[in-house]
Regions:
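Short solvent-exposed loop/turn micro-motifs enriched in small/polar/acidic residues
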Residues: 29-30, 90-91, 207
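Early extracytoplasmic/domain-onset interaction patches
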Residues: 27-53, 57-59
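Mature, soluble, non-transmembrane domains
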Residues: 101-217
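Short, solvent-exposed beta-strand/turn "edge" segments of beta-rich domains on protein surfaces
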Residues: 23-25, 37-46, 115-121, 202-205
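Bacterial N-terminal signal peptides that target proteins for export
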Residues: 1-9
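Structured domain cores in non-transmembrane regions
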Residues: 56-136
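N-terminal signal peptide c-region/cleavage motif recognized by signal peptidases
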Residues: 17-21
Length: 217
């Protein structure tokens, strides 16, 4: 099967692969706002994401979707696509790598998911919450969001607070960092031939991880 039919987070991956197959990775760009959600007892219950896709990919994704007003898609119009997105993301672990006190946390299937469309910027934003299988009180949480194969590029949204804590104990401290820019050695070409040799196990995209850390007493 074509690589890009299996390496997509939206149902239009085949179209995207055909249009961009000769180009280097990444093929999809996502800007995100992340929220870590706490219960009243101070336990961490899950992650709330808002991921905005680039305009080109959003255009592919909305092709063929009937809208009540041309060029304006409601949440109802986009509901089937949102469901497909969430189903596809499960295969990739929601591009989420999270540890508490050094131990990997298991994730449940997302809730409260929907897509919004911004007609001005012509982009889609996927909103969803990923609960932890077991809420946890932790002194040390580390979260990374990235695609191991770098098909998708994730970056924090350019706002004052791209990452927030919701309901966390007041003494908890949040820090986050962006990945460094990729440095390519002279003569090294990072086109499709290079990436076709990689698999998720190579974890090449880890160098582009957006890192979040929460320390609580």
């Amino acid at each position: 099967m074509n690589r890009y039919f299996t390496r997509t987070i939206l149902t239009v991956a085949g179209l995207l692969a055909g249009a961009a197959g000769a180009c280097a990775h990444p093929h999809v760009w996502v800007t995100m706002q992340d929220e870590l959600v706490y219960a009243p007892d101070g336990s961490l219950t899950g992650l709330r994401y808002s991921w905005t896709f680039d305009d080109m990919f959003s255009a592919f994704a909305t092709q063929g979707i009937d809208a009540k007003k041309p060029g304006e898609f409601t949440r109802e119009d986009l509901a089937p696509l949102a469901k497909e997105n969430i189903t596809s993301l499960k295969d990739f672990g929601y591009f989420t790598f999270v540890k508490a006190n050094g131990k990997k946390l298991e994730l449940k299937e997302p809730t409260d998911y929907y897509l919004d469309y911004n007609p001005k910027d012509t982009v889609l934003t996927l909103h969803f919450t990923v609960p932890f299988k077991t809420p946890i009180k932790t002194k040390d949480l580390n979260l990374e969001v990235y695609d191991p194969e770098y098909f998708v590029d994730f970056s924090f949204k350019d706002v004052k607070e791209p990452v927030t804590l919701s309901g966390a104990p007041s003494a908890c401290k949040l820090t986050f960092s962006k990945p460094q820019d990729l440095t390519v050695a002279p003569g090294q070409q990072l086109g499709e031939a290079f990436f076709n040799q990689l698999s998720a196990a190579d974890n090449w995209g880890a160098q582009f991880a957006n890192k979040i850390s929460v320390k609580c007493p």
